Structures are given as C-alpha cells and as structure tokens.
C-alpha cells in the first residue's frame, strides 16, 4: 500500500483508491494540460476530476497500481500537496485577465511559486496573491 503523500498520491476515504494532483502554478492551465489530465482520467478510469482549493486539478479514485503510470503519462511535476512545506501558491487573475485588477497578481504568484513552492517549513504554509 502506498503511504499518504508517497509518489504524490493521497489515499482516499475508501482506503483503496488514490488521488493525484499535479502542480499547476497559480492554477493557470493550457489546453494541452487539460487534454493530458482528461486522457489520463479516462485511461485509468478516475472516478472524478476535482478542482482543488489550491487551484490544482486532482484525478480522484485511482487504483494503487495505476498511480505511477498516471504520473508517467502526465509528465507533470507532482508538486507539494502534503508535508511541512510551502504548498501551491494561489493567485487571482489580476491585471492579466480581470477588469478590476490593479496589480499583476499572476506574475507575482508565478515568481513566488518559483522561489518558494515545496520549500521545507516548520509547518505547512499556504500563500495567496490578490490583485484588486
């Protein structure tokens, strides 16, 4: 049995299936990333695709034997979803996409992500950037 957090997998309530949530800096995805996620979800019969509060997209309900195969197919960073570290940095659209944006929150969030994502800390740390 995979331990919680091992191989970037999180055990689900049923204690038999897992979720994986690739690192998606500031929640910004491309059509290619969405296709990869959808293709993996179909191929490995994920129970659901779930948008997380950390602006990631989780493939939920995966079989233990499929976890490593999913990561190989996705070819994406596992990111820091568990442990005592800086988790995914969240950001609003800011001036890039929002008419109310007055600051480049996505740009700042991406910079913070490059600098701090996954950095070990005494406790889990979450960051958010607002541009309005």
Annotated model-derived regions:
Residues 20-131:
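Small-residue-enriched alpha-helical segments and adjacent helix-cap loops
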Residues 1-33:
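N-terminal basic/disordered segments at the start of proteins
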């Amino acid at each position: 049995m995979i331990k919680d957090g091992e191989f970037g997998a999180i055990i689900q309530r049923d204690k038999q299936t897992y979720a994986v949530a690739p690192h998606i800096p500031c929640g910004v995805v491309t059509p290619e990333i969405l296709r990869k996620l959808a293709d993996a979800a179909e191929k490995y019969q994920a129970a659901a695709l779930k948008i997380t509060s950390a602006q990631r997209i989780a493939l939920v309900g995966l079989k233990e034997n499929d976890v490593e195969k999913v990561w190989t197919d996705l070819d994406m960073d596992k990111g820091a979803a568990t442990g005592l570290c800086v988790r995914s940095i969240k950001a609003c659209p800011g001036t890039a996409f929002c008419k109310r944006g007055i600051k480049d929150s996505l740009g700042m969030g991406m910079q913070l992500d490059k600098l701090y994502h996954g950095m070990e800390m005494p406790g889990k740390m979450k960051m958010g950037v607002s541009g309005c």
